[in-house]
Curated annotation (Swiss-Prot):
Gene Ontology molecular functions: undecaprenyl-diphosphatase activity
Family, per entry: Belongs to the UppP family.
NCBIfam families in UniProt: PRK00281.1-4, undec_PP_bacA
GO-annotated biological processes: cell wall organization; peptidoglycan biosynthetic process; regulation of cell shape; response to antibiotic
Function: Catalyzes the dephosphorylation of undecaprenyl diphosphate (UPP). Confers resistance to bacitracin.
Annotated Gene Ontology cellular component terms: plasma membrane
HAMAP family: Undec_diphosphatase
Keyword Glycoprotein found: no
Membrane topology: Multi-pass membrane protein
PANTHER family linked to this entry: UNDECAPRENYL-DIPHOSPHATASE
Name of the protein described by the UniProt record: Undecaprenyl-diphosphatase
Amino acid sequence: MLLLELLKALILGIVEGLTEFAPVSSTGHMILVDDMWLKSPEFLGSQSAFTFKIVIQLGSVFAAAWVFRKRYFEMLYIGKYQPAATETESADGKIGKRVKPKRLTLWHVLVGMIPAGILGLLFDDVIEKYLFSVPTVMIGLLLGAFYMIFAQKFSERYAHRENIDQITFFQAFVIGLSQAVAMWPGFSRSGSTISTGVLMKMNYKAASDFTFIMAVPIMLAASLLSLVKHIGYIHLSHIPFYIIGFLAAFIFGLLSIRLFLNLINRIKLIPFAIYRIILVIFIAILYFGFGIGKGI
């Protein structure tokens, strides 16, 4: 029996790692895989199961932090991590002053974090209490899918900036607003912010990079805060489940993020939107047709 429960923890960690940063909604997948199928509260208890989900989400967050570690070092440290200054040349061929190239800074990330940070502090308990249900998640999945389709179709009419270092503070703030909207479960943080990024004339890779770089600090803070609030529900007997789930989420998070970043400029958003619509149909059949998940 213990082996079966450890296998369930492994599966949940894999699902979390694969879906947390893809624009497919990790919440929707957790409802399908855990709430409707594996039912972690049955072997962990309801509060401990919630803590387990926080722990495996941290695995995904650390995976993203590892992938973008050089970017964070560049934003936080000086020295070899800072881009070198370059000399400018005037029209008459004379060498002018040395200037540093434009680049993404910590201030861009902080500006992007402001909307979701404020909304999370004010309404986190309300969102958790009233919006975490199967019907509301299905609504979020559908709305997010339609927004992704709109973003891809509408943005095809203009050229996109190729480099994340060209992002402006205004773009960062607007993308941050969309991250706040994505606090509706099922909408998908990455789906919302990448879509907004391409609408703001960023290319898909640059929008994805900024999405992940911006998400790590706020997700890390939110996860650690939730973990502190629920620390009393961690039991020594559950530690193996936490370790397996965390490691699975970290490893598969690394694979998922790297694969996604390599593909996003080619496949764009519509394939993910179609997948989300199919997922909604599947969940709806289980929920309305067979009553699976009615107690969620």
